[in-house]
Amino acid sequence: MEAFLQKAKQASRAIATLLPQRRNEILRAMAGAIRESQEMILNVNALDLKEAQASGLKGSMLERLALDGPKIAGMARAIEEIAMLRNPLGRIVDGWVVENGLRIEKVSTPIGVVGIIYESRPNVTSDTAALCFKSGNVCVLKGGKEAKRSNEAIASVMQAVLKANNLPIEAISLLPDASREGVAKLVKMDQYVDLIVPRGGNALISFVSENATIPVIKHDKGLCHLYIHEEADFAKALPIVINAKTQRPSVCNAIETLLVDETIHERFLLELRPLLEEKGTEIRGCEKSLKILGGKRASEEDFHTEYGENILNVRVVKGFEEALEHIAIYGSQHSESIITQNHSIAERFLEEVDASSVYVNASTRFTDGGEFGFGAEVGISTSKLHARGPMGINELTTYKFKIYGEGQIRK
C-alpha cells in the first residue's frame, strides 16, 4: 500500500505541470478509447451484474451497476465535456498590493493526490478520473466490490492512454487493497494523500470519518424534502412532486419526504393521488395523509431513511415553522425545495434552510454539476468546508499565494 501511494504522490508533479492544451488532448483520447472499448467494458460489466444478482443485490443498486451502449457513450461524452471546461488552474482568485509595495496574488492550484471512495456506479470511475486529471490531480479510486471488474476495465483503458502519452499510470489508479482494512489504511496515509472524498451510505461515511487523519469532504445521503406551502400553485406543485420523486428514485437528489400545509392538504393530496398511483409510488404517511392517499404509517425511522426506491413519506404540517423544524431535524443538508407564490415566505425558506442547494418552485433533481452548468461532478458535498453542493473541477483545486517583490525586507 505505501509503495503504491508513494508512486501516486510522485506522479502528482507530472500531472500538475501539464499544459492545459496537452491535458485536454489526452482527455479527448481517453473518451475515444472508452468508445472503442465498449464491447470489452460491457462484457466485464455483465459478469459483475451476474455475480451481483446471485449475491442478492437488487433494485436501485443493480440499476446503478448496469452499463449499456448509451451509458458508455454518455461516459465518453462526459469526458469530452470535461475537456472543454475552462482550465481551473492558474486562476487569479484575488490580488492586491500592500503598503510596502509587495504584489500578492491568490492563485488556484491542484490539491495533489485525491482518494475517492464510492459505491456501485462504474461511470463514477471515468467521471472522477477525468475531473481529477483536468484539475491537475492524481486520483486513487476505490469503487464498490460489486463493480470490481467494470472499474478495472475502465481504469485500464484510461491508463493505457496515459502510458501512450509517456505519463505515469499511477495518475489514475484503483486502490490495490479494496478491503475494509485497505480503506482504513488509505485514509490514514496523510504523507501521500491530500484529500479523501467518500460518497455513499451512512456506514461508509461514518467509517471514513472515524478513521481518517486526512481531510474529508463528505458526500452523504440525500434526505431531500419538498414542502407545499399553503400559497402554492398546484399547476406547478403537482408535476414537481412527480418529477422529484419518480423520475429517478435511486439518485441522491430525489425527494424522500413530501410536506404539505394543513390548510390545503385535502385538496392537494386528492389531486396528487392518481398521479402517484400511476407511477406506482409506495406511500408512508401520517394519519391525515393516509386518509387520502392510503399506504403504511410512517415511522420515525422512515423519516431518517434514504430509500433510493419509489417510496415517499408524506406528512401534513401546521405551517411554515413546522415544515422548517422537520427539515432541520431530518434533512441531510443536501437539497430542499418549497412551492409557494408568497415571495417573502420563499425568501425566508432560502435564508433559513441549512442545505447545500435550496429551491423555490423547482424540483430538487437539478442538484447536479451538469444542470448547474459546470459539467460533471465528483459528487454532491454535504460538508460545509471547502466544497458544498455539486463538487466540480473548481472544487478540486486549492490555492497558493504568489508574492512579487523588488527587494523588500521585513522591518
Swiss-Prot record:
Organism: Wolinella succinogenes (strain ATCC 29543 / DSM 1740 / CCUG 13145 / JCM 31913 / LMG 7466 / NCTC 11488 / FDC 602W) (Vibrio succinogenes)
Gene Ontology terms: cellular component: cytoplasm
Compartments it resides in: Cytoplasm
Official protein name in the record: Gamma-glutamyl phosphate reductase
MF (Gene Ontology): glutamate-5-semialdehyde dehydrogenase activity; NADP binding
Catalyses which reaction(s): L-glutamate 5-semialdehyde + phosphate + NADP(+) = L-glutamyl 5-phosphate + NADPH + H(+)
UniProt lineage: Bacteria, Pseudomonadati, Campylobacterota, Epsilonproteobacteria, Campylobacterales
Family of the protein in this entry: Belongs to the gamma-glutamyl phosphate reductase family.
Top enzyme class: oxidoreductase
